[in-house]
Regions:
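Sec-dependent signal peptide recognition
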Residues: 2-8
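Terminal, low-structured helical/coil segments at or just beyond the last alpha-helical repeat
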Residues: 121-156
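Hydrophobic face of amphipathic alpha-helices that form TPR/SEL1-like repeat modules
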Residues: 19-25, 40-41, 52-59, 63, ...
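N-terminal signal peptide c-region/cleavage motif recognized by signal peptidases
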Residues: 12-14
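N-terminal leader/linker segments that initiate helical-solenoid repeat arrays
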Residues: 16-36
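Short helix-capping/linker turns of helical repeat alpha-solenoids
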Residues: 29-30, 43-47, 59-61, 66, ...
């Protein structure tokens, strides 16, 4: 058992270092280099890298802004429980950018999951969405939250 844990730690070390280096590059404005480092991590399932690639596409950082790709990367990360990506998905549903229309029920759901996951800004976004919703929409959103929460956060 100890050998397995040690092996996992050794494998995770370089990935963590690559993620931190890519974040530093992104903060320094070298978006293309950051994206090149994020992509292999994201393709291997790293939720942080997936979320940050989503940010790059959503904001057009080093790439042409592409709402569909941003949403797809955010969704991959969101389904792994990444609170920042869940807020990103919530924002897309709230605004309706790249969609036929806003979907406040789904926005509420994703902001709630993000808040449960620890994103402090999600509660603020949730308050704003509630102001735009009917009670029937809020009730429907609560059902979705309970459904997703059950499999996304089984121990909470």
């Amino acid at each position: 058992m100890k050998k397995h844990v040690l092996a996992l730690m050794l494998l995770a070390g370089p990935a963590f270092a690559d993620l931190e280096t890519a974040r530093d590059l992104m903060e320094a404005g070298d978006f293309e280099a950051a994206r090149e480092m994020f992509l292999p991590l994201a393709r291997s399932g790293n939720a942080d890298a997936e979320e940050l690639i989503g940010v790059m596409y959503a904001m057009g950082l080093g790439v042409e802004r592409d709402d569909q790709r941003a949403f797809e990367w955010y969704l991959r990360s969101s389904l792994k429980g990444h609170p920042g990506a869940q807020s990103g998905i919530g924002w897309y549903y709230e605004i309706g950018r790249g969609m036929h229309a806003p979907d406040l029920v789904r926005a509420y759901m994703w902001y709630t999951l993000s808040a449960i996951g620890g994103d402090p800004d999600a509660a603020i976004s949730l308050e704003e969405v509630v102001k735009k919703m009917t009670q029937a929409e809020i009730d429907k959103a609560h059902i979705l939250v309970e459904d997703y929460k059950g499999w996304m956060y089984p121990l909470r």
